[in-house]
């Protein structure tokens, strides 16, 4: 099997941070070479843009925000993702372009056609081989976000914003079931872990 590009995505409060540890443990047990990274971020340029994008004090228009996301992504692809894949290393990214369709598209209202143009220009033919989409009901997401001490620029949004974000994620997953695995992360930790491990086992033929 060629090196796999796997993404982990979902609305805020879906438990990505917790379940990244599950994925790391899965790769470690099998001794598979893997690189973990994140978006926006993953490079010095990307991390600098992340600081701007998540800062609650940032006043950026929709197009500027979207372009910053893709600028960080282009650097990420060129400097991190493609080199790792070329070296035979699997890549797991905490968020990727699905998040742009969901947050800037669904949440903010950026036309999906414009995002698709940028996606093609920045990524070429690069697409994830597998996307683990962590999903929780809106009220669970909002409750978990409410427990965050310092909310970033996106976490400060209201429930209707996250309702639109979640809807886009689920619609994209339904339209491409061969790539997406929707994980109910409202279940207990053991059940979520088992679900993720089952998907990875199936994808890698373990």
Swiss-Prot record:
Kindly state which reaction or reactions the protein catalyses: dTMP + ATP = dTDP + ADP
PANTHER family membership: THYMIDYLATE KINASE, UMP-CMP KINASE 2, MITOCHONDRIAL
Protein name as it appears in the record: Thymidylate kinase
Q: Identify the keywords attached in UniProt to this record, alphabetized.
A: ATP-binding, Kinase, Nucleotide biosynthesis, Nucleotide-binding, Transferase
Give the E.C. number(s): 2.7.4.9
Q: Which GO terms describe its cellular component?
A: cytosol
* Family note: Belongs to the thymidylate kinase family.
Role according to the record: Phosphorylation of dTMP to form dTDP in both de novo and salvage pathways of dTTP synthesis.
Q: One Pfam family name from the record?
A: Thymidylate_kin
Binding site residues for ATP = 10-17
NCBIfam families per the UniProt record, alphabetical: DTMP_kinase
UniProt source species: Neisseria meningitidis serogroup C / serotype 2a (strain ATCC 700532 / DSM 15464 / FAM18)
Q: Which InterPro entries match?
A: P-loop_NTPase, Thymidylate_kin-like_dom, Thymidylate_kinase
Q: Which GO terms describe its molecular function?
A: ATP binding; dTMP kinase activity
Q: Name one GO biological process term.
A: dTDP biosynthetic process
Q: Which EC class, in a word?
A: transferase
